[in-house]
């Protein structure tokens, strides 16, 4: 109660009791004001939203800032690594110099890839992507060179990153056109006014009068000067060509062609090309950028040997300038060198249809072409794909290896010498082809010498092949290789060779001092005119005379074997052969001195045929239409078995001689390289045909001495004995 009374008393007893409500009102108003202020403060969070809109925090928004911040650190790390590996002079050698990275040297390498006066009939297209990759430079550096070359019409644009190389064929026409445009725009007068103004500025600091400023302020805009036939009417190029580097390059060349002393400084060129009215608006940094672009143009023109750098001494000091060094226009030398280009428009029409198609599609004037909507969609899709491909970063990847600089130098040298090496390779290929053709075309002639006919790895085996009209005996002369000589440990063979009876010579084989061989040959042909062969008509070589036989005998060797093989006739023979002298008592004598005869007897059984390359028949003079056939396979089989050229291990084979006692290699068809028709010679009234057969160079000598037996000398058909049936089967048919 006391507290309540106190409150009531205090409330009622206060002299200012009537004023307390207003005080409460004022306090409430202050509270409301604070609340309103607090509510007003609630709007402040909207400001960070505005900052976010200004600088959005996206992954790619500050990519440039991150790269610029990280690139110095990356470069410093690379330098530290190089400094650790190299020190002093070695570090300077590894780092590329400014000269290696200069635009002038790059332009020299670019020009070395292409001829100065190309053939317009050849497709001389240039792909900038390939050139940038081969020269290992950025693509923008190639663009700078190509833009300057395009201003001089040394190249023309075919498509995106595709150009056609014209070389110096159009330089004289380009200089004529540029000089005319420069005279129309009064560039010579402007150069003189600027030079006078510089002199006046040196004398006094006063500004030049208005009369001298008018020509510079009101200079007309000069577009890109195009030659007839080399225009490119693409709208995308024409929209920005006034600001391109190639237009500035043309104007820079105009200043040299028009000025009286053909020396122009970069400051004067920049003032004329940019214009003094624009120089006031441009900053110093932009003006310096323009001068740098002029430096790039001057470097390319210097590499083309059109200008050279000089220094001009003035009152202010020494200034760099450039002097025109190109010879006079339209000289006779240039016309003579460019004379192969008289058919340039026709050749261009044939070699570059894409360029003409592009010109027709973007033709200017009243006549225009429209595309079908489907083609427009297709063209847009192709352009989008090309943009995606070309938008990829073209800067080269820097490798951490120390040999990258050496590799780049070698690549640049290879790019410079590529054309010369390609020409030398083409010449060497042609020479190799010619030599290979000559080696293949060396065919062995029938009547040639033995050196040309016989290769180094094998020798010839001469064979005497009789005309098989009446199945006379075959005679085989087997010649060993040149390297083979009869060993001294085989006296029986030598002795048996000496025991050859001289009273039974082989008819048709001429010996030294034998004068009756020719007459016997003639008489044998007269006695048997009907037995001359008919198949000799198709032979590729003619019958050799007795003198030709001498040539053959000179090439043979004294360690051969003479193998007479008699084949029984298929049909019954006339009685003339039986009434003749007994041939069984005679031994065959080799036409070569030192060659011993060898008689064979067939055993009944089949005989394996040997594939032999034989020539066709040849017509023999003196015959009455009769024909000869190629040697029988059986004869070659037994002859080569005796020579140990093929194996005789077949069942019921032929037993040749006692010396054939060991295994022998089989003669393959590839080892018989040549069968040569030498000469037909008669023997006992029966004509023989001599063949030359190539033999392997493996030396084969008789293995031992065997006693002479009766069966060894027995000739089939001799001493009144009938020939075996197996011998009759050998001469059944001819081998074509």
Swiss-Prot record:
Biased segments, Basic and acidic residues type: 509-539, 726-736
UniProt keyword annotation of Cell cycle present: yes
Transmembrane residue ranges: none
Record InterPro entries: E2F, E2F_WHTH_DNA-bd_dom, WH-like_DNA-bd_sf, WH_DNA-bd_sf
Compartment list: Nucleus
Annotated stretches, region: Disordered: 1-26, 386-405, 435-456, 483-551, 716-736
Keyword entries, A-Z: Activator, Cell cycle, DNA-binding, Nucleus, Repressor, Transcription, Transcription regulation
GO molecular function, one term: DNA-binding transcription factor activity
Record's keyword annotation contains Transmembrane: no
GO cellular component term of the entry, any: nucleus
Database matches in SUPFAM superfamilies: Winged helix' DNA-binding domain (SSF46785)
Superkingdom of source: Eukaryota
Start-end of Polar residues biased regions: 15-26
Feature: compositional bias, Low complexity: 393-405
DNA-binding region: 98-167, 240-326
Pfam families with a match to the protein in the record: E2F_TDP
GO biological process, alphabetically ordered: cell cycle comprising mitosis without cytokinesis; chorionic trophoblast cell differentiation; hepatocyte differentiation; negative regulation of cytokinesis; negative regulation of transcription by RNA polymerase II; positive regulation of DNA endoreduplication; sprouting angiogenesis
Assembly: Homodimer and heterodimer: mainly forms homodimers and, to a lesser extent, heterodimers with e2f7.
Family note: Belongs to the E2F/DP family.
Functional note: Atypical E2F transcription factor that participates in various processes such as angiogenesis and polyploidization of specialized cells. Mainly acts as a transcription repressor that binds DNA independently of DP proteins and specifically recognizes the E2 recognition site 5'-TTTC[CG]CGC-3'. Directly represses transcription of classical E2F transcription factors such as e2f1. Acts as a regulator of S-phase by recognizing and binding the E2-related site 5'-TTCCCGCC-3' and mediating repression of G1/S-regulated genes.
Domain notes from UniProt: In contrast to classical members of the E2F transcription factor, atypical members contain 2 DNA-binding domains and regulate transcription in a DP-independent manner. Both DNA-binding domains are required for DNA-binding and are proposed to form an intramolecular structure that is similar to the winged helix structure of the E2F-DP heterodimer.
Protein name, UniProt field: Transcription factor E2F8
Organism field: Xenopus tropicalis (Western clawed frog)
The gene coding this protein: e2f8
């Amino acid at each position: 109660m006391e507290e309540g009374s106190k409150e009531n008393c205090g409330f009622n007893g206060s002299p200012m009791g009537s004023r307390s409500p207003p005080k409460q009102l004022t306090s409430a108003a202050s509270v409301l004001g604070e609340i309103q202020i607090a509510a007003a403060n609630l709007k402040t969070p909207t400001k960070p939203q505005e900052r976010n809109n200004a600088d959005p925090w996206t992954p790619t928004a500050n990519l440039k800032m991150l790269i610029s911040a990280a690139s110095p650190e990356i470069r410093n790390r690379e330098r530290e690594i190089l400094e650790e590996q190299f020190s002093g002079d070695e570090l300077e050698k590894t780092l590329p110099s400014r000269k290696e990275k200069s635009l002038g040297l790059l332009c020299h390498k670019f020009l070395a890839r292409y001829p100065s006066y190309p053939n317009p009939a050849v497709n001389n297209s240039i792909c900038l992507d390939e050139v940038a990759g081969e020269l290992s430079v950025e693509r923008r550096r190639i663009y700078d060179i190509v833009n300057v070359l395009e201003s001089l019409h040394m190249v023309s644009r075919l498509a995106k990153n595709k150009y056609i190389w014209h070389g110096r064929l159009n330089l004289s026409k380009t200089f004529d056109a540029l000089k005319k445009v420069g005279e129309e725009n009064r560039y010579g007068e402007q150069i003189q006014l600027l030079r006078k103004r510089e002199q006046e500025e040196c004398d006094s600091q006063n500004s030049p009068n208005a009369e001298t400023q008018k020509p510079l302020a009101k200079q007309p805009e000069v577009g890109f000067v195009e030659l007839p036939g080399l225009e490119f009417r693409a709208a995308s190029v024409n929209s920005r060509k006034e600001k391109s580097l190639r237009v500035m390059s043309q104007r820079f060349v105009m200043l040299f062609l028009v000025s009286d002393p053909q020396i122009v400084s970069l400051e004067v060129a920049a003032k004329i090309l940019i214009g003094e009215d624009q120089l006031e608006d441009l900053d110093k940094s932009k003006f310096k950028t323009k001068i740098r672009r002029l430096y790039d143009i001057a470097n390319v023109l210097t590499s083309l040997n059109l200008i050279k750098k000089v220094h001009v001494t003035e009152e202010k000091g020494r200034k760099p300038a450039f002097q025109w060094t190109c010879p006079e226009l339209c000289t006779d030398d240039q016309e003579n060198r460019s004379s192969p280009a008289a058919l340039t428009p026709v050749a261009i029409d044939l070699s570059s249809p894409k360029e003409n198609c592009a010109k027709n599609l973007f033709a200017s004037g009243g006549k225009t072409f429209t595309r079908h909507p489907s083609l427009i969609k297709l063209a847009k899709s192709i352009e989008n794909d090309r943009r995606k491909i070309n938008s990829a970063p073209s800067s080269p990847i820097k490798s951490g290896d120390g040999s990258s600089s050496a590799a780049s130098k070698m690549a640049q040298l290879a790019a410079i010498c590529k054309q010369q090496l390609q020409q030398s390779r083409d010449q060497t290929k042609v020479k190799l082809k010619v030599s290979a053709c000559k080696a293949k075309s060396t065919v062995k002639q029938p009547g040639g010498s033995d050196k040309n006919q016989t290769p180094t790895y094998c020798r010839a085996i001469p064979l005497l092949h009789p005309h098989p009209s009446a199945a006379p005996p075959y005679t085989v002369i087997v010649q060993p290789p040149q390297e083979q000589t009869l060993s001294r440990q085989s006296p029986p063979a030598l002795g048996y060779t000496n025991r050859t009876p001289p009273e039974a010579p082989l008819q048709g084989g001429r010996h030294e001092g034998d004068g009756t061989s020719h007459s016997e040959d003639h008489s044998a042909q007269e006695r048997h005119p009907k037995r001359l062969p008919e198949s000799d008509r198709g032979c590729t070589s003619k019958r050799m005379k007795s003198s030709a036989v001498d040539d053959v005998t000179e090439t043979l060797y004294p360690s051969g074997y003479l193998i007479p093989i008699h084949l029984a006739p298929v049909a019954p023979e006339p009685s003339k052969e039986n009434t003749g002298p007994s041939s069984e008592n005679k031994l065959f004598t080799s036409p070569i001195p030192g060659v011993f005869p060898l008689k064979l007897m067939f055993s009944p059984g089949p005989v394996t045929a040997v594939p032999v390359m034989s020539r066709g028949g040849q017509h023999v003079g003196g015959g009455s239409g009769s024909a000869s056939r190629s040697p029988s396979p059986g004869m070659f089989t037994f002859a080569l078995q005796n020579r140990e050229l093929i194996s005789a291990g077949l069942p019921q084979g032929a037993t040749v001689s006692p010396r054939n006692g060991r295994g022998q290699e089989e003669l393959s068809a590839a080892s018989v390289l040549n069968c040569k028709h030498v000469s037909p010679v008669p023997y006992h009234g029966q004509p023989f045909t001599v063949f030359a057969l190539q033999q392997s160079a493996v030396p084969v000598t008789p293995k031992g001495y065997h006693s002479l037996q009766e069966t060894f000398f027995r000739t089939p058909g001799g001493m009144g004995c009938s020939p075996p049936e197996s011998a009759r089967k050998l001469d059944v048919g001819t081998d074509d």
